[in-house]
């Protein structure tokens, strides 16, 4: 199976429209959170939430028109509830692989949504039965993989990394840290930070073949 994974579109509809350009080359499209835009923070929370929900509606319509199998999760900058066939809310098996959504992120200085401490991350990950047939569709990166900030410091979760080292899923797909769109191996697990350059309207991500585990960067 060929997967295209991206993340952090942040309401940029130019980026969403570009998903059409990769759809024909893959079997599955995954968007790893932060769907809604960041504009409009001065509005009431309800208005802002509805604004973001319209971004999710637009993404869903794009995915529906593409017709390639697709799923997305929400991230820490998404402040809305959502119901949609493309929204991966529970474990699903697609093409013989188990896809597990994981929307939590490690605590940040910005008091965003879905933030938890390392102990909570460890607890939530402990609920899953995972292994070499598992693809984690996550938002947060593990420590030392796709987690480098603009100042060079690492901000990933040590418990997420420990879980990956122990369980060894096939893939950990994430975003969250826009500065570190990268690929890293942790043992037999390939960690791909798929975050877009949303301010400039640049679609970024990775195409990965789950049979051969070959992967290539995409930037459009």
Language-model-detected regions and their locations in the chain:
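Binuclear metal-dependent hydrolase catalytic cores centered on His/Asp/Glu-rich metal-binding motifs
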Residues: 95-135, 153-162, 216
């Amino acid at each position: 199976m060929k997967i295209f994974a991206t993340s952090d579109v942040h309401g940029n509809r130019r980026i969403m429209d570009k998903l059409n350009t990769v759809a024909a080359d893959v079997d599955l499209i995954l968007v790893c959170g932060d769907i809604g835009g960041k504009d409009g923070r001065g509005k009431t929370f309800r208005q802002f939430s509805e604004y973001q929900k319209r971004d999710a509606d637009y993404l869903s319509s794009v995915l529906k028109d593409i017709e390639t199998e697709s799923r997305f999760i929400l991230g820490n900058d998404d402040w809305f509830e959502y119901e949609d066939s493309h929204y991966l809310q529970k474990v699903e098996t697609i093409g013989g692989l188990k896809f597990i959504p994981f929307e939590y992120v490690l605590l940040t200085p910005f008091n965003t949504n879905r933030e938890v401490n390392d102990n909570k991350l460890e607890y939530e990950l402990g609920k899953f039965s995972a292994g070499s047939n598992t693809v984690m569709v996550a938002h947060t990166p593990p420590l030392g993989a796709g987690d480098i900030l603009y100042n060079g410091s690492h901000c990933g979760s040590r418990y997420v990394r420990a879980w990956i080292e122990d369980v060894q899923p096939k893939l950990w797909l994430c975003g969250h840290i826009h500065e570190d769109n990268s690929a890293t191996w942790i043992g037999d697990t390939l960690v791909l930070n798929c975050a877009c350059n949303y301010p400039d309207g640049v679609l970024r991500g990775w195409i990965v073949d789950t049979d051969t585990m070959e992967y290539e960067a995409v930037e459009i």
